Amino acid sequence: MINYNKKTLKDVDLKDKTVIVRVDFNVPIKDNKVIDDTRIVQALDTIKYLIEQNCKIVLLSHLSRIKSLEDISSKKKSLRPVYENLKTKLNNVKFLEENVGYDVVEAVKQLKHQEVLLLENTRYNDVDNQGEVVKKESKNSPELGRFWASLADVFVNDAFGTSHRAHASNVGIAANISQSCIGFLVQKELEALSKLTNNPQRPFVVILGGAKVSDKLKVIESLLKSADQILIGGGMVNTFNKAKGYHIGKSLFEPEMLETAKKILAEDKDNKIILATDQMVTKASTITDIKTAPAGKCVFAKDEAENEDFEALDIGDESIKTFKSYIAKAKSIFWNGPLGVFENPNYERGSYEIAKAISESDSYSVIGGGDSAAAANQFKLADKFSFVSTGGGASLTFMEQTVLPGIEAIQSK
């Protein structure tokens, strides 16, 4: 069991200090406007506390992935829209369209106490001036980490969503600065998820969806030891159903994961894994985009002919009923991954019914970020859960009981 006993904001003398904060402002942007500012809002508690401590505050974040010079020169992945949003929420916010070099050093020097400076997308450093993909941020370049660390007295990691990665903007800074701590958001995340890994109230029920078994393999293996039931839907159930010898038509699955799926099912001696066995399907040959696929019919995987022209896009009524019966008895619940193509009204029912059942239960319930959080928001049910994590991959890594490098790098109490 991993217990993170890390310094928090309250454990460090921050008065009048220059503080560099890794935030997660990786938000959706359309037409140069932020269309969902949840992550910006969630960072405000930490930023406002630092303002109260009379700090000079430097903010770092990534936005999307940077794969070419075009990604930079087009400014489509610039944090400027984030700055425009942030300055409606805070006074004294500045933005610099750079994050390394002389201008950055000067801008930080000129910062006044209680001012906030947002630097440009950290991943601009993943491509050099010649267009070569060098991944200085994503591969934790020591030189980059040292530069950012040199700007401040204290480093605060408040980006839970990237804490499962060792980047220059989290691990790199922490390794090169004399004081580091976690922010309020990361603190909340660790406390909320720890309730599921440290003696959870039982029954402890896990619902896993999404497309790939490969993404969830480690978490399934870990949760087989700690959970009472693991309910599996979404695209990943196709690989398990295929491994059981059921027919899945033309549904997407991972051929390279079939043997692993068989092994997991064989190791499940206590029958903790409950698979969605009926699904809502549509004619595979007519699908151009799953998000606009027409309504289909319900089929049971074990009854279908092998080469039938169908693709499963949601769990069916029987599976919904079975899953809801386990959810009703649960005292702790972790949900990661939608159970169908919830963006399509014809295939949102599985995710909606399960989200609604969890929201109505008396259990301690956590959504593990990512698409399941997006689904809960779409159904206007997110506020009915005990906690909604900001990190899909990071929450899974935490539930795997694997070390989160971005947290591990922070000084212990």
UniProtKB/Swiss-Prot annotation:
GO cellular component, one term: cytosol
Enzyme class, first EC level, given as a word: transferase
The keyword Nuclease is annotated on this UniProt entry: no
Keyword Coiled coil in record: no
A GO molecular function held by the record: ADP binding
UniProt EC number: 2.7.2.3
PROSITE patterns listed in its UniProt record: PGLYCERATE_KINASE
Catalytic activity from the UniProt record: (2R)-3-phosphoglycerate + ATP = (2R)-3-phospho-glyceroyl phosphate + ADP
Binding site for substrate: 24-26, 39, 62-65, 123, 165
Pfam families referenced in this protein's UniProt entry, alphabetically: PGK
Subcellular location: Cytoplasm
GO BP field: gluconeogenesis; glycolytic process
Similarity comment text for this entry: Belongs to the phosphoglycerate kinase family.
Protein name stated in the entry: Phosphoglycerate kinase
Organism: Mycoplasmoides gallisepticum (strain R(low / passage 15 / clone 2))
